[in-house]
Amino acid sequence: MKDEQMLTEWPSHLPWLNQSQNDFTFPSDTYLLLYFWSMSCPNCHQLTDKVLQDIKDMNVKVIGVHVPYIEEEKSMEVVLTYALDRGLAIPIVLDQNYEIVTTCHVQGIPSFCLLSQYGQIITKTMGDVGWDKMLKKIAGL
């Protein structure tokens, strides 16, 4: 597969919340689901709790990739406060310069990107309809 269809390492300079990036190396012991979201995204607000509930007992690790809409959302403190207020305990990486977004070819949020244990992009979806499709894909792993 082409390099742009792989995420073989995390950009080392990006800040993480709730966990260290060193806990997520490739190859991984499980599939990884990247959940691209933003504090300013109304659809993300509606979908986040459903995503976390649906995925709870599945063989996949969720990583929230925060995509800033505005400059203020590049602040780790602002995102941390939001995550604490919402009870988001999942690992969150702040993709402040859209590096992971670019690697995964994400075109809008909320979006989902399923990675193999080796960082290969298996499938990508967007929105609530996309979430339903992603659930079916994960259930078939």
UniProtKB/Swiss-Prot annotation:
Per its UniProt record, what Gene3D superfamilies does this chain match? Glutaredoxin
Superkingdom of this protein's organism: Bacteria
Induction section of the entry: By Spo0A and PhoP, during nutrient starvation, especially phosphate starvation. Repressed by AbrB during normal growth when nutrients are plentiful, in association with the transcriptional repressor Abh.
Question: Is Glycosyltransferase tagged as a keyword?
Answer: no
* Domain Thioredoxin, chain residue ranges per copy: 2-141
- Establish whether keyword Disulfide bond is in the entry: yes
The annotated phenotype of a deletion mutant is: When the skfA-skfB-skfC-skfE-skfF-skfG-skfH operon is deleted, increased rate of spore formation; a double operon deletion (sdpA-sdpC plus skfA-skfH) makes spores even faster.
Q: Name one GO biological process term.
A: bacteriocin biosynthetic process
Q: Which UniProt keywords apply?
A: Antibiotic biosynthesis, Bacteriocin biosynthesis, Disulfide bond, Redox-active center
Q: Quote the InterPro entries the UniProt record gives.
A: Thioredoxin-like_fold, Thioredoxin-like_sf, Thioredoxin_ResA/DsbE_sf
One of this protein's Pfam families, by short name? Thioredoxin_8
Q: Which CDD domains match?
A: TlpA_like_family
Coiled-coil features, chain-numbered ranges: none
Disulphide bonds annotated for this chain are: 41-44
Q: What else is known?
A: Accelerated cannibalism by skf- cells is seen on solid media but not in liquid media.
Q: Sorted alphabetically, which PANTHER family does this protein's record hold?
A: PROTEIN DIPZ, THIOL:DISULFIDE INTERCHANGE PROTEIN DSBE
- What does this gene product do? Required for production of the bacteriocin SkfA.
Q: What is this protein called?
A: Thioredoxin-like protein SkfH
Species whose genome carries this gene: Bacillus subtilis (strain 168)
